[in-house]
């Protein structure tokens, strides 16, 4: 499975087919856990050492951008979701707050996986990437400040639904979105290409596994729906590539309904 994809652990519904990760099922070439494994596009004649231009690909790390889309979309609509909560409507505020909490946990886990599993390995094999990695670490530290502030601001608003309590949440969302606007494209442009000529598929899959284990219990279908809806085609290709047929069936019959029901509660009366 590409880096840091959907984490289904802790949710009993995630057991079918090994959860909504890259299944590596019949007909999918490449290393364990996913298609397009080592050497997917490098081919004969590729030159250069790990991390250098022209080096052969050793893994498929497209999942970084796929998860980034979910994070960007989810936090990006945060202000509108909060604006759709009527003054004092604590029930609706709790639904929106729970959604933002899920996104916060997902981003926490995504960055934790990179901090513990990626940076040292990448720097050791591609020393020329040291400057990029130092910048990523600094950006993660900044994001941690914003996410910690969000985690602290959410409970009061979820309990009251009052605009006075929403103000703190909105401030933290502004900080998160500003930081994401810098960090995500920087990582995709400067780090992911180095990953794809430096890491093995098993190492990329370990990042995915770290993320999978972090999904809060009961949030599997909601997070899967968020990932799918953030993809350019609505997630059709993502499903075909990442989900084995039995899991796609479970999503269509059970998961999609749960996601859509939650989405209806979540959106409520969004104001322009």
Stretch-by-stretch model annotation:
Residues 1-272:
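Small-residue-biased structural context
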């Amino acid at each position: 499975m590409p880096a840091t994809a959907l984490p289904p652990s802790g949710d009993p519904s995630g057991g079918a087919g090994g959860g909504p990760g890259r299944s590596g099922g019949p007909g999918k070439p490449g290393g364990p856990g996913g298609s397009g494994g080592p050497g997917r596009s490098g081919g004969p004649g590729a030159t250069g050492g790990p991390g250098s231009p022209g080096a052969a690909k050793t893994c498929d790390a497209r999942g970084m951008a796929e998860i980034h889309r979910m994070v960007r979309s989810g936090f990006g609509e945060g202000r509108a979701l909060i604006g759709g909560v009527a003054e004092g409507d604590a029930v609706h505020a709790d639904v929106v707050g729970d959604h933002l909490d899920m996104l916060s946990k997902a981003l926490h886990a995504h960055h934790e996986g990179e901090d513990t599993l990626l940076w040292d390995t990448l720097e050791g094999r591609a020393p020329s990437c040291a400057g990029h990695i130092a910048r990523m670490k600094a950006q993660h530290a900044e994001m941690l400040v914003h996410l910690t502030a969000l985690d602290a601001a959410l409970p009061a608003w979820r309990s009251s639904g009052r605009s006075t309590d929403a103000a703190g949440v909105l401030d933290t969302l502004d900080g998160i979105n500003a930081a994401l606007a810098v960090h995500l494209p920087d990582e995709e442009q400067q780090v992911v290409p180095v990953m794809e000529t430096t890491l093995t598929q098993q190492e990329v899959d370990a990042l995915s596994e770290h993320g999978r284990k972090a999904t809060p219990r009961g949030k599997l279908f909601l997070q899967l729906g968020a990932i799918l809806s953030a993809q350019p085609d609505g997630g059709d290709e993502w499903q075909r590539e990442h989900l084995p047929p039995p899991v796609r069936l479970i999503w269509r019959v059970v998961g999609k309904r749960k996601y859509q029901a939650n989405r209806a509660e979540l959106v409520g009366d969004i104001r322009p």
